[in-house]
From Swiss-Prot:
This is Tumor necrosis factor receptor superfamily member wgn. Induction: Down-regulated by bacterial infection in the gut. 'wengen' is named after a village at the foot of the Eiger mountain after which the TNF gene egr is named. GO terms for cellular component: cell surface; plasma membrane. It comes from Drosophila melanogaster (Fruit fly). The keyword Cell membrane applies. Residues 223-343 are cytoplasmic. GO terms for molecular function: tumor necrosis factor receptor activity. GO terms for biological process: apoptotic process; negative regulation of neuromuscular synaptic transmission; neuron cellular homeostasis; photoreceptor cell axon guidance; positive regulation of programmed cell death; tumor necrosis factor-mediated signaling pathway. Receptor for egr. Involved in induction of apoptosis by triggering JNK signaling. Mediates the tumor suppressor activity of egr which eliminates oncogenic cells from epithelia, thereby maintaining epithelial integrity. Following UV-induced epidermal damage, binds to egr released from apoptotic epidermal cells and plays a role in development of thermal allodynia, a responsiveness to subthreshold thermal stimuli which are not normally perceived as noxious. Together with Moe, involved in control of axon targeting of R8 and R2-R5 photoreceptors, independent of egr.
Amino acid sequence: MMPPRLPGGHGGAMRSRSSSSGHHLNTTFHKRRRRRQQHHIGGSHISISHGSYLALLLLSTTCSLVATSASSSSSAANTDIAPPDPPPVSQVSIASSSPCAPQHWWDSQRDRCTPCTRCQGEMIPLRPCQLHTDTICGSIYDLKIDWVVLAKTEPNWKERRKSSEYEHFEHNAPLQHLTHEQLQQLHEEAAAAWVLDWQTGVLYVAVLTCLVFFSVAACILIHHMRQWRRMERRLDQDVEELSTKLMAKLAEVQSLDGGTFFIGNADALRGLPASAATTHPATTQSGIFQPQHVLLPEKRGKHQERRILKTLQPGNVYIEESNAGLGGMGVGLGVRGCSGLKG
C-alpha cells in the first residue's frame, strides 16, 4: 500500500516548481521515500509467497509418502493371510507328462495320449486333431457353407468366405444344417444361373460375329467401288480414243463417196500454199480434229480422182492439182494402199 499523500501535496509541488527551489527539494525527498517504501513492501510479499510455496510442497510430499507406506503394508498383510490358489489338475498333469507323438492328442480324463480318430466312409473331418481335442467328423451338410454366396459370381466372394470361416472358428457358432430339399433348390438356382451365363456368352459371340461380318462387307464394298471408278475412267478414255479413230475413218470414207466430211484445222490450211499443204499432211492427221464442214469438189473432179486412185499402187501418194472448184488452192491427198483418203 502506498502511504497517503499529504493534503495539498500535488498542488504544493506544482506551486514549488513555479515559485522556489526549496520546495522542489522537499518534494524530491518525499518521492524517494515513497519509492523505498514500495520496494520494501514488494520484497516482503515475494519472500512470503516463496516461503508458503516451499511449506506446501514439503507437506504434500510427506502425505504421499505416508499413503504409499500404508498401502504397501496393507497389501503385504492380505497376501500373508490369503492362501494361494491350487493349480488345476490338468495343468499339473500336462506339465509333468511328456508331449504326445504326432497324430495323438492328450486325453485329460484318461490322463494319457490317445491316437486321433480317423473319419470313415462318407464322413469328412470338420475339425482336425489338436493337442487337447480329438478329430471332429461329420458330413458335408454339417459344414457352414453359404451356397447362395458361392452361386453368385462376385469379385469378393473369396474374402466373404474367409471372413465367415474366421468368425465361425473365433466365436464357436453352431453349425448350420441344410436339408436335402434346400440343397437341391440351391443346386437348381446355380444351374439356372449357369444357363443364364451360357446364354449371355452365346449372345455376345453372335453380336461380335455380326459386327465382324458387317465390317468385312463394308471393306469389300469400298474396294469394289474403287475398282468400278477405275474401270469407268479407263472406259471413258477408251471411248474417247475410239470416237476419234471412228471420226477419222468416217472422214476417209466420205471423202471418197462425196458429200461433207470433217477435217482437222481446216482454217489453218486455207491460207497455206499448195506446197505447204502437201508437206504437212501427217501433222493434220495426228492433230486434234476441229470439225469443219467442207464441201467436196464437183462430181467430174471426184470421178477423175477415183480413176487416178485405181491406177495407183499401194503406198503414200500425194497429188497436187488446181482447178476452178478448189479456187486455185492445192490440196494434199494421202492414200495408204487404196484403202482410204486422209486429208
